[in-house]
């Protein structure tokens, strides 16, 4: 391809896997297929835009026609890293190989960890389950104020959060507790991606979070393609939870989002900006609201809604743009339990520059091929890991 692209847009449909990975059994996953099982469950998905790009050319999905002339280059990617969580998937997409998986705790944290927190702080722990912060604050806030017990909770991600009223646990004490939790969860058996202090104020029935949230994250252990872009003077616009996933490393602008549809609004607004570099969008609702909650109908509706917004995206793309749509892991809502599933992820690569449409790319053996392609496009330092497919885009 003679000219490089001025802008590359990476869209991660969080948890939208496309079929069981060869090593799924090692992760306790059998016959998992996020996209396929959702489509079967609802009697077929109505996603004409993804269909035109070539989604069903990767493998047939009920309700989505195989494109005779797909607009995009298409294949699927296999995760090489030893994990199936959000951080592992995204870090690998940007050129890292993760040997030790981050841990998630869908049933709450083990007694040993809770005991360490209680012994260190002299405070009891209440909660200890996956929950939305506002819900658990409403549920346990009054008990916390009366007893001084710490509200500890998690989410679908590798995270330990501690909520406390600022009049009950002073901020400095809360931060010290979180620093202690960070120190004891850096390695196995806990290996948590993030500890978050969640202070709040107010009276029972009217508790509100304060802006004094503090995150104790893990930074990527090596520079990623995002760092290479930033160091090379390129823009890296992170939309959604991308900046959190990378602890702000390699990000030149961060835009928070409230939902998938807000994420698409923000992304479409970014397409109107004049920039030279990468936009990187994560759409988390698929995973957080529907995958973990095992809600295939809700998941299907969200996929259809996403497809509807692609019309606006396609209208704004020029020959200087490259759009890459993928995922970071699976989360089959028809499967048992509440955890992610080890799957291939789709890869669709489109530009209006492809006058003859796209064709099949070879199967990618690591998500890092995507990051290598971005680095190759912008002539910045290539990651140690991953093989560019830029030359295959004609």
From Swiss-Prot:
Keywords from the named record: Cytoplasm, Isomerase, Manganese, Metal-binding
Transmembrane segments: none
Protein's pathway: Carbohydrate degradation; 2-deoxy-D-ribose 1-phosphate degradation; D-glyceraldehyde 3-phosphate and acetaldehyde from 2-deoxy-alpha-D-ribose 1-phosphate: step 1/2
Compartment(s): Cytoplasm
Top enzyme category: isomerase
Reaction(s) this enzyme catalyzes, per UniProt: 2-deoxy-alpha-D-ribose 1-phosphate = 2-deoxy-D-ribose 5-phosphate; alpha-D-ribose 1-phosphate = D-ribose 5-phosphate
Cofactors named for this entry: Mn(2+)
Coiled-coil region(s): none
A cellular component annotation (GO) from this entry: cytosol
Chain positions recorded as Mn(2+) 2 binding sites: 287, 292, 340
Gene Ontology biological process terms, A to Z: 2-deoxyribose 1-phosphate catabolic process; 5-phosphoribose 1-diphosphate biosynthetic process; metabolic compound salvage; nucleotide metabolic process
Residues annotated as binding Mn(2+) 1: 14, 328-329
Enzyme Commission no: 5.4.2.7
Cofactor note: Binds 2 manganese ions.
Gene Ontology MF, one: phosphopentomutase activity
Family affiliation: Belongs to the phosphopentomutase family.
Role noted for this protein: Isomerase that catalyzes the conversion of deoxy-ribose 1-phosphate (dRib-1-P) and ribose 1-phosphate (Rib-1-P) to deoxy-ribose 5-phosphate (dRib-5-P) and ribose 5-phosphate (Rib-5-P), respectively.
Name the UniProt record assigns to this protein: Phosphopentomutase
């Amino acid at each position: 391809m003679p000219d490089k692209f001025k802008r590359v847009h990476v869209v991660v449909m969080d948890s939208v896997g496309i079929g069981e990975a060869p090593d799924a059994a090692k992760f306790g996953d059998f016959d998992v297929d996020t996209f396929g099982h959702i489509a079967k469950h609802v009697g077929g998905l109505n996603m004409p835009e993804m269909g035109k790009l070539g989604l069903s050319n990767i493998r047939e999905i009920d309700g989505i026609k195989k494109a005779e002339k797909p607009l995009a280059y298409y294949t699927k990617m296999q995760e090489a890293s030893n994990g199936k969580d959000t951080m592992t998937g995204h870090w690998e997409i940007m050129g890292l190989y993760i040997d030790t998986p981050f841990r998630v705790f869908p049933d709450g944290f083990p007694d040993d960890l809770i005991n360490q927190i209680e012994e260190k702080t002299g405070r009891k722990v209440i909660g200890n389950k996956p929950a939305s912060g506002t819900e658990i604050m409403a549920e346990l806030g009054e008990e916390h104020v009366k007893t001084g017990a710490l509200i500890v909770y998690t989410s679908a991600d590798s995270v330990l959060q501690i909520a406390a009223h600022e009049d009950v646990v002073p901020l400095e004490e809360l931060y010290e507790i979180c620093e202690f939790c960070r120190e004891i969860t850096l390695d196995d058996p806990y290996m948590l991606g993030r500890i978050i202090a969640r202070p709040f104020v107010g009276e029972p029935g009217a508790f509100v979070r304060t802006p004094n949230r503090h995150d104790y994250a893990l930074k990527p252990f090596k520079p990623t393609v995002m760092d290479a872009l930033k160091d090379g003077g390129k823009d890296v616009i992170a939309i959604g939870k991308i900046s959190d996933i990378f602890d702000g490393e390699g990000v030149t602008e961060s835009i928070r989002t409230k939902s998938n549809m807000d994420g698409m609004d923000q992304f479409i607004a970014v397409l109107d900006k004049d920039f030279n570099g990468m936009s990187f969008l994560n759409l988390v609702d698929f995973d957080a609201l529907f995958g973990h909650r095992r809600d295939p109908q809700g998941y299907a509706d969200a996929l259809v809604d996403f497809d509807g917004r692609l019309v606006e995206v396609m209208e704004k793309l020029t020959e200087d743009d490259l759009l890459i749509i993928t995922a970071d892991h699976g989360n089959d809502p028809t499967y048992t339990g509440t955890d992610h599933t080890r799957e291939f992820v789709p890869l669709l690569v489109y530009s209006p520059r492809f006058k003859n449409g796209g064709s099949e790319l070879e199967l990618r053996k690591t998500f890092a091929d995507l990051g290598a392609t971005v680095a190759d496009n912008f002539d910045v330092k290539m990651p140690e890991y991953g093989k560019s497919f830029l030359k295959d885009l004609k």
